[in-house]
């Protein structure tokens, strides 16, 4: 006959509560799109200029010299059409479709930027923190500060801005490469100084600032995907995408 041994106390109940996640698996924070005011100001300046340019292109020949719509809105294009023949009578008479095709893409690009600004102002908030990729607020002041949009709207804003900026840079590079591979057919007649101040500098702005936007929004998208994938990210601070709650 087998006897059972008595125990001085009962066995403890098993702990069924989930264990707390380790710091490497859980972090207190959230992703956010944090464009600097520099980005926003660039868009507020460039969009009217692009609309002006697109209007000239799509309303030719009425917007060209001698046309009923030329004065006073598009008078400066009298000079620019002599600097760059792609905007002048030469390309128009030759039925060169590049100018109008680029103007059509300008419309799509501008609508994307307008939708982006709508998201920023309808769902975002201004912050004194430094925007990602922006100069320090101690030196740049307001230009370096950010607008903050988190959640799905922030992700959508970053995606739209990245796509539009890639479109801007690609379209501008195509414009430059078209000249290079045609032997500078439309701008080769200019002096070096005229070329620098009337063509390279004005058009170069649409390479520099959108490239900055690609860097900023691309970094944000990459970091957001890294967070979702469970990868390590930099610790959060005022300029990071992961905002501490």
Give each language-model segment a name.
Residues 9-20, 123-153, 235-241:
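Intrinsically disordered, low-complexity domain-flanking/linker segments in eukaryotic proteins
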Residues 30-110:
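N-terminal helical submodule of small eukaryotic multi-pass membrane proteins
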Residues 34-46, 129-166:
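Interfacial segments of alpha-helical transmembrane regions
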Residues 42-48, 97-111, 159-170, 194-205:
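Physicochemical signature of membrane-embedded alpha-helices that form the seven-helix bundle of GPCRs
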Residues 51-53, 169, 214:
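Hydrophobic residues within the alpha-helical transmembrane core of Major Facilitator Superfamily
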Residues 59-84, 126-138, 182-190, 224-233:
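Interhelical loop segments of eukaryotic multi-pass membrane proteins
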Residues 138-140, 168-202:
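Juxtamembrane loop segments immediately following a transmembrane helix
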Residues 190-245:
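Terminal transmembrane helical module of multi-pass membrane proteins
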């Amino acid at each position: 006959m087998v006897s059972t041994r008595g125990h001085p106390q009962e066995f403890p109940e098993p702990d069924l509560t989930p264990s707390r996640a380790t710091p490497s698996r859980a972090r207190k924070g959230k992703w956010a799109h944090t464009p600097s005011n520099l980005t926003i100001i660039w868009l507020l300046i460039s969009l009217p200029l692009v609309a002006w340019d697109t209007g000239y292109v799509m309303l030719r020949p009425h917007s060209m010299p001698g046309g009923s719509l030329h004065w006073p809105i598009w008078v400066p294009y009298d000079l620019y059409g002599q600097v760059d023949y792609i905007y002048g009578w030469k390309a128009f008479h030759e039925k060169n479709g590049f100018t109008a095709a680029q103007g059509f893409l300008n419309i799509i690009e501008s609508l994307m930027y307008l939708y982006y600004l709508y998201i920023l102002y309808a769902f975002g908030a201004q912050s004194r923190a430094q925007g990602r990729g922006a100069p320090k607020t101690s030196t740049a002041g307001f230009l370096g500060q950010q607008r903050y949009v988190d959640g799905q709207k922030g992700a959508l804003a970053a995606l739209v801005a990245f796509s539009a900026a890639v479109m801007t840079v690609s379209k501008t590079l195509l414009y430059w490469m078209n000249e290079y591979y045609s032997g500078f057919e439309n701008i080769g007649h200019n002096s070096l100084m005229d070329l620098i101040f009337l063509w390279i500098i004005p058009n170069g702005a649409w390479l520099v600032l959108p490239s900055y936007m690609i860097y900023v929004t691309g970094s944000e998208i990459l970091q957001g995907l890294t967070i979702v994938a469970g990868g390590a990210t930099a610790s959060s601070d005022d300029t990071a995408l992961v905002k501490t709650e």
